[in-house]
Amino acid sequence: MSFLSNFFKKENKDFNMSQPSELETYFQQFRKNIVGIGHTFQSPFGEKEIIYTDWTASGRFYRPIEEKILNEFGPFIANTHTETSITGSAMTMAYHKARNIIKQHVNASKDDVLIADGAGMTGVVNKFQRILGLKVSENLKNHTTVPDELRPIVFISHMEHHSNQTSWLETIANVEIIPCQDSGLICFDSFEKLLIKYKDRPIKIASVTACSNVTGIRTNYYKMAKIIHQHGGLCFVDFACSAPYVHIDMHPKDEESYLDAIFFSPHKFLGGPGSSGVLVFNKKLYKNLIPDNPGGGTVNYTNPWGDHDYVDDIETREDGGTPGFLQTIKTALSIQLKEKMGVENIIEREHEINKIVFEKLTKIPNLNILAAQHTDRLGIFSFYIKNVHFNLIVKLLNDRFGVQTRGGCSCAGTYGHFLLHVDQQTSKGIEKKILEGCMVERPGWIRMSIHPTITNNEVLYVCESIKQVAENYEEWAKDYTYNSIKNEYIHNTANPIEIELVNKWFESNNQ
């Protein structure tokens, strides 16, 4: 804590190291094993401790998980698809056990199948769309005609990540954004009107986020599931943002509120980086004779004359080639860690932290928190400083304070239009300039996202850092030059340490 205490002493701030709450103390047993805690780097303004507040983008390595994979799983690493040798058999069993742990965690039924693929939710939602037969090759689009009355209709919220919006726009489906209330929440009356409007469509899908990755606002996806099921539709839920922190239950007590499919990104879990995306869906949705990735492990028999028979089991059929068994094992281990921390503890601790953040940031005169009226949220705060480029703020927080945040639209550009009140004419003007190579007017914000393992003193430090940047950005900006091509701010004299750092990482990889 020396970096933090020295900072406040230097700035003559009244900073008493607070006594940790019971929950803060509870989470310290997990905090001490996070790789990177206390790590420093050399900034243009001296040595800084990394204060990580970018959890919505990625989780962090957890040392016991990395050591377990290395020391316990490692000696038995081998390809799966065999139960004869000890190594192959052990890995095959470990892979299947990991899959079962994931299924149990989301309360999947015997009729639900699991597919792990890609690097996160983006990979599995695109795979799911192909499995559903909703994707047509770009080269064939001009030769494919689907009458409007036969096109699936997909309903999304205004809060979606690009992966749960643009991916649907590239299918044969029509996509409708469900209108929101003045409060910024989904309007269910409007949703029901849309369902009536499209009542004759053969396939009706609601694909919605469980939680905004911009504001931390959670959606009532069970209510949405119940409504669309009553209209003969399907409900898919994107848990990419919230999966590390909340209960996931595909089959709640209200039978009409079941979820037909879910997807999430385990790399966002503590301990999860390096894992695959996860998709779980009801097998009734699978109508395919040919797997999405035909290959090793998907066939029962082939011969030289072109005959081939695919396996019947859906999970095996859609797991072509060598599966990502280590990625799936890591997902299971990070889920077990989440369960050990306890969802109730996680949520309650985040409420403690959120209270501090709101109290401190709302006092900064030139700072605006997006959707600030919604205080019941996960620990995600997106904000902007009036008339200041978001990436300048991110850079100053990094260089002067070591605070890791993220600037931009958080891959939620459509939601940004709602939050920043960007009308269509203004949007078109911005788009035109972006296409011409001018990025400076691209809308965005600064996002900080916390984890229950962060300490109160770190939270106070982050908030004080933001306050100082908001007060001093004009003077501090003189140290930087704006790069319009990269839309980034570059320090005028200091060499980027990242180049030397990364080159050093790869120098001794074989030693």
Task: Label the model's feature ranges.
Residues 2-511:
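Pyridoxal 5′-phosphate
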